[in-house]
């Protein structure tokens, strides 16, 4: 979407041996043209949005900010749009994912903890949300019809509908009202709306989600215990590291179980993946860094500029984690993983 609207993509390397971005490198990457920062909640662990907020509020960063529309002027600083695709149900510093940043986006894709088969949701938390929009707004070169008395919260909701429905100013139901056939298309925008059927699936999932999260917590605890036992017999240079999904200031959604075979190469990690597959266990890698992908190479990105991200990738394996698995399944995965890693 960043490229689609004509904005420039800027990537920041991760911290050394940590999946969160390097926040000081983030500060160095900010220019007068920076409009939004997108921290990612990898594996369901909330990023440190409070740290990002502290950075964008630094006097020297505020002095660089050049707003380009009324929302940016009202914010008075760079916006923070949190990628919460993995973190539905997670919290950090007592706040839930979706209420921490200015804007947050969730994915309800089929492989997510909470699914509607496809689609997602967006939340926002703006101090001026209930203020009235004073004048017509223009987005992506297209004037958005002005509604007298509309608040900014209402406007952002309407704008989201327009962006996701070919910029049509009426949905299918509205067009069926008596004498209300006519509609307008205000811009060459997108088709990515969630259907009512998908939303119905989500409403049912809400009832089950707390128990699903609880099971994920138990599965991760079993994985942790198994790997702790493995590390007790491995030498210090070849420990298996896993993400900390729960601590005094955070609790993740326990979406993915990432491990790193420290001191090992990508080839050795791939060997483990192949050995696990031979035993009927599907594993994954999260993720191959974006600068290694063709689309981003074409934008001029080079993985050599992101050594920490590459270091995280070069020996990472993701063990299976979903609520269709039984605790016996988790035990089977652990037993085989331990046996294979010991044999490296």
What is each residue range found by the language model?
Residues 1-84, 91:
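PLP-dependent aminotransferase-like
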Residues 5, 100-101, 238:
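Short, structured coil segments at secondary-structure junctions
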Residues 31-35, 94, 101-102, 314:
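Active-site acidic short loop of glycosyltransferases
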Residues 36-40, 45, 49-53, 91, ...:
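PLP-dependent aminotransferase class I/II
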Residues 67-116, 147-148, 181-185:
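Conserved active-site segment immediately N-terminal to the catalytic lysine
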Residues 105-106, 115, 120-123, 199-201:
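Short glycine- and hydrophobic/aromatic-rich loop-to-beta-strand nucleating segment
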């Amino acid at each position: 979407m960043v490229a689609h609207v004509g904005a420039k993509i800027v990537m920041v390397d991760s911290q050394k041996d940590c999946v969160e971005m390097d926040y000081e490198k983030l500060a160095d990457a900010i220019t007068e043209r920076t409009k939004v920062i997108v921290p990612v909640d990898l594996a369901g662990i909330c990023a440190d949005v409070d740290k990002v907020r502290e950075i964008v509020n630094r006097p020297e960063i505020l002095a660089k900010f050049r707003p380009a529309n009324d929302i940016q002027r009202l914010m008075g600083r760079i916006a923070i749009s949190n990628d919460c695709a993995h973190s539905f149900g997670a919290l950090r510093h007592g706040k839930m994912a979706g209420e921490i940043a200015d804007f947050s986006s969730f994915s309800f894709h089929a492989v997510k903890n909470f699914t509607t088969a496809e689609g997602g949701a967006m939340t926002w938390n703006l101090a001026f949300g209930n203020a009235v929009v004073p004048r017509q707004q223009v987005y992506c070169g297209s004037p958005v019809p002005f509604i007298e008395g509309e608040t900014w919260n209402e406007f952002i909701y309407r704008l989201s509908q327009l962006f996701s429905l070919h910029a049509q100013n009426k949905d299918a139901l509205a067009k069926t009202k008596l004498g209300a056939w006519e509609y307008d298309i205000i811009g060459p925008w997108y088709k990515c709306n969630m259907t009512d059927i998908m939303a119905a699936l989500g409403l049912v999932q809400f009832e089950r989600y707390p128990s699903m999260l609880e099971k994920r917590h138990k599965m991760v605890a079993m994985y942790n215990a198994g790997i702790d036992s493995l590390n007790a017999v491995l030498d210090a240079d070849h420990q298996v590291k896993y993400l900390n999904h729960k601590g005094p200031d955070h609790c993740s959604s326990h979406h993915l179980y990432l491990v790193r075979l420290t001191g090992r190469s990508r080839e050795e990690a791939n060997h483990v993946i192949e050995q696990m597959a031979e035993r009927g266990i599907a594993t994954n890698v999260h993720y191959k860094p974006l600068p290694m992908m063709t689309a981003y190479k074409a934008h001029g990105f080079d993985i050599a500029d992101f050594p920490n991200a590459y270091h995280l990738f070069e020996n990472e394996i993701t063990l299976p984690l979903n609520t269709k698995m039984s605790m016996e399944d988790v035990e089977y995965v652990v037993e085989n993983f331990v046996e294979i890693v010991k044999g490296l």
